[in-house]
Each structure stands twice: as structure tokens, then as C-alpha cells.
Amino acid sequence: MEQFYYILKYLILGLFQGLTEPIPISSSGHLVLAQHLLGLKIEGFSFELLVNSASLLAVLLIYRNDLIRLTKNGLSYIFTRAEDAKSDFFFIIYLVIATIPAGVIGVLFKDYIDQYLKGVKMVGISLLITAVGLWIIRNLRGRKNDGDLSMKDAIIVGLAQACALIPGISRSGATIVAAMLLGMKQETALRFSFLLYIPVSLGGLLLSITDIAKDPNLDTLFVPYIVAFIATFIMTYISLKWFMNIMAKGNLKYFSFYCIIVGVLTLIFL
């Protein structure tokens, strides 16, 4: 019976993670709220690593063609200086640059963030900040394509991503808001945001991989962890495909409304 409880618990958290990871409402913030509201305390170090791995796998699957093209053209430009591969080569460079702020800040301030910025009230405030950003860009229509990006764009989007280390600040929301304020087209902003998720997530996995071996609950929670992984992967795939359609229709304001409602309710009642 206890094992069934754990399976159900991690199934719920996995579905929750998968649903909220791609869309701009902060998956980390919602996990904090879900644990608080449902009284679900996560045992062990490996859960966040596990569900992030599942979300990463779903993103890799969806953007596989972009990744293949970027890799092919990036190598082509390095070895042949092919002019038609130049924009993809620099797109990769800008992704690397944009990864740096979150990586540096995450390493230096992880303990501080975990101790002081993961409270329920902080999540409420951060969701309201996310809502404001999404509202500001609701009608923006930029002109920048992949080939029009600059180092300045990469640095600013990278700094925006670093802000999302705070639960309640959506990673996809922060990066898309920054990208669109810099004049990127919606599809360019979306692609840059989720391709940027890949190196950041991989870096986090590499830094945390030893947590699995140290997890004292791994034997007990092996099956629930697998259930959470599968649930997160499937839900992330579905949620990201849905979000891509929402972006294409320019309906980001609905996510802003949602973040306002949840943020206000969190501050009042939790």
C-alpha cells in the first residue's frame, strides 16, 4: 500500500512537472506550490534531476531536426567557411554565450537560492513578475530571424534565464520575454528559448549526477521514480507542442492572466 502511495505521488508530480515545464508559468514554482498544497514532501536528491532529464529528452525529440541542422551547418562553417552555414554557426555561439549567466549564478548562489528564495510567498511574488513580462509582450511582433541575432541579444537573454533560478520566474517566460523585447520574431524567440534549455539542463544534470548515488531512498523509490520519468516525458512533449500552437496564435496573455490569479491567491491564502 505504501508503494502504491509513492507511485501515485510521483505520478502526480511528474505530470505536474511535464505540464508546467514548457509553458511560461514556472514549473519549479508550481512544484513548490503542489508540495505545499498536497503535503507532498519529496524524499531524496534525485527527483528534480530525474524529471529534468525527462523534460530534456522530450525537448530533444521535438527539436531534433533543428539540432541536426545546427550541428551539420556549424561543422560546415568551421571547416569550409560556407557562407550559407554562417548564421547557424553563430546561432550556436550565441546559445553557448546565453548559457553562461545561469551556469555561473547557479553554481555561486545555489545554496542561497535554496535557503531563502524557495518559499511559497516568494513563488507568489515571482509569478506576478512573470505575469507582467508576459503582458508586456502580448502584442509584440519582432523582425529578427536566427541570422539577425547579436552577442548583446545572447547576453541579455542569458541574464533573463538566470532570473528563472528563482521559483516562480518562468524560464521559458523570462527568455521569451527578453527575446521579444529585443525584437525577435515569436518563432525565433521560442526556438532560441528551448534550444537554450538543452545546454543549461545538460549542465545541471552533469553537476548533479552524483546525487543519484548518494540518494538514500533510491532503492525504495526506484519504481516511483521511473513512473515520474515516463509521466514527465509524455506530458512535456504534449505541453510543448500545445505551447508552440499557442505562440503561433499570439495568445500569451492567457498565461499572464493565469500567473496573476495563482500569484494573488498564493499571497493571500498560503
Swiss-Prot record:
Its EC number is 3.6.1.27. This is Undecaprenyl-diphosphatase 2. InterPro entries: UppP. It is an enzyme of class 3 (hydrolase). Keywords: Antibiotic resistance, Cell membrane, Cell shape, Cell wall biogenesis/degradation, Hydrolase, Membrane, Peptidoglycan synthesis, Transmembrane, Transmembrane helix. It is a multi-pass membrane protein. The lineage of its organism: Bacteria, Bacillati, Bacillota, Bacilli, Bacillales. Belongs to the UppP family. GO terms for cellular component: plasma membrane. Bacitracin is thought to be involved in the inhibition of peptidoglycan synthesis by sequestering undecaprenyl diphosphate, thereby reducing the pool of lipid carrier available. Catalyzes the dephosphorylation of undecaprenyl diphosphate (UPP). Confers resistance to bacitracin. PANTHER family: UNDECAPRENYL-DIPHOSPHATASE. It is found in: Cell membrane. GO terms for biological process: cell wall organization; peptidoglycan biosynthetic process; regulation of cell shape; response to antibiotic. Its main location: membrane. The chain crosses the membrane at residues 5-25, 42-62, 89-109, 117-137, 192-212, 220-240, 250-270. It comes from the Bacteria. It catalyses: di-trans,octa-cis-undecaprenyl diphosphate + H2O = di-trans,octa-cis-undecaprenyl phosphate + phosphate + H(+). GO terms for molecular function: undecaprenyl-diphosphatase activity.
